[in-house]
């Protein structure tokens, strides 16, 4: 993500005729250097692309005060809101790709084995650090127990550890993120949620503290940022685990009594980036998808459309402003200009220019009658009035 998200916007901006100033996340400086090297080796003029190294708190103001024409930002909703306010003071347009609290709806006729595997793929890939990943799962009651059993099996099989082809996911990126996830889980457990599964973490470094299946703090044998995959069973959508972005390997699962309840609860969020519907009925899946308040909805899949460059990417509500990818990204990177040519430039003046009198009014009204009059007589009368006006007003050099 630190490479893929900026590089497609940078490439599109350059191909659209823009110059680019790029600042990457503080934790990802080598990625910026790689993009700069790619641009240089592609043969673009050096002045078209600049990489800057600034702290996040300084970068926004520096960019906005530096005379840019548009600001693109990917990050938290809180930071995006601040940048939009500051850009608004300067009337600088913005495109914001922000957070998500993405919902997965599993209907009673869903392919449950695929749904369980898909929930783990979309919920914990990159250790759950995907803005478009699954964070909330709503399952219709007839499918709930079977789905939950399959989901637990999938989580038990997750292999987590350092870089290797023999592991499925790695670690979190920052200690700050680990603390946030831990706080959300502990708050949910205090509100009555149940931790029903936690994946094994087999690494060889210093220990860390994470909640165990009883909600108590336990020592995790592994590097502190290797947070286990956890399934949390919840009954209500209160609390930060269900309302705020988690950005970690936590799957919050809840049973619903109907597709109507699933839609209502999925939409009961300040975010609206992505969502998914799982069902073997095209009619049901389409009906539910059409009512979800999300910029991207996938059917029987999740966390995959970002890799389709032709499809627009962006969210509803507090998940962002604008769209990236595809034709809409090009529109975000260009200004609309209208150029109108007069077809009769040798005419001395248009018939509706001054001086104006009643004959002009009647002649123009006759044009309307000629075009839209009801019946042949009103149209012929309109044509007569129009031709009288043209004969009097039209003069060429």
Describe the residue ranges of each PLM region.
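ALDH superfamily catalytic-core signature
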Residues: 43, 70, 78-236, 299
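A generic structural signal for well-ordered alpha-helical segments
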Residues: 13, 87, 151, 188, ...
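Short glycine-enriched loop/turn motifs at secondary-structure junctions
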Residues: 65, 98-99, 131-132, 166, ...
């Amino acid at each position: 993500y630190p490479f893929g998200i900026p590089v497609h916007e940078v490439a599109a901006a350059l191909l659209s005729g823009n110059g680019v100033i790029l600042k990457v996340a503080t934790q990802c400086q080598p990625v910026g250097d790689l993009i700069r090297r790619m641009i240089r080796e592609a043969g673009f003029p050096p002045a078209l692309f600049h990489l800057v190294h600034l702290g996040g708190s300084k970068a926004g103001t520096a960019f906005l005060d530096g005379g840019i024409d548009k600001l693109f930002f990917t990050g938290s909703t809180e930071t995006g809101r601040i940048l939009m306010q500051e850009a608004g003071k300067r009337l600088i347009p913005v495109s914001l790709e922000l957070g998500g609290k993405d919902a997965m709806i599993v209907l009673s006729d869903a392919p449950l084995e695929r749904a369980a595997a898909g929930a783990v793929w979309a919920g914990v890939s990159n250790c759950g650090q995907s803005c478009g990943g699954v964070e909330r799962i709503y399952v219709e009651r007839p499918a709930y127990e079977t789905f939950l059993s399959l989901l637990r099996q999938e989580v038990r099989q997750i292999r987590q550890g350092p870089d290797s082809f023999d592991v499925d996911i790695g670690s979190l990126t920052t200690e700050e993120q680990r603390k946030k996830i831990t706080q959300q889980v502990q708050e949910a457990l205090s509100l009555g949620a149940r931790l029903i599964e936690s994946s094994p973490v087999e690494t060889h470094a210093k220990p860390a503290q994470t909640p165990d299946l009883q909600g108590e703090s336990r020592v995790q044998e592994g590097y502190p940022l290797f947070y286990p995959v956890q399934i949390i069973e919840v009954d209500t959508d209160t609390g930060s685990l269900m309302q705020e972005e988690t950005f970690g390997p936590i799957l919050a699962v809840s049973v619903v009594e109907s597709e109507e309840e699933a839609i209502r609860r999925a939409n009961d969020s300040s975010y609206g980036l992505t969502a998914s519907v799982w069902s073997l009925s095209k009619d049901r899946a389409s009906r539910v998808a059409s009512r979800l308040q999300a910029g991207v909805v996938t059917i029987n899949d999740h966390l995959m459309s970002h890799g389709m460059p032709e499809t627009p990417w962006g969210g509803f509500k507090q998940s962002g402003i604008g769209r990236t990818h595809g034709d809409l990204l090009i529109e975000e990177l260009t200004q609309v200009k209208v150029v109108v040519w007069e077809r009769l430039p040798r005419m001395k003046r248009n018939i509706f220019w001054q001086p104006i009198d009643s004959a002009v009014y009647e002649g123009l009204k006759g044009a309307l009658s000629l075009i839209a009059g009801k019946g042949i007589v009103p149209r012929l009368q309109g044509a007569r009035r129009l031709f009288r006006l043209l004969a009097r007003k039209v003069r060429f050099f």
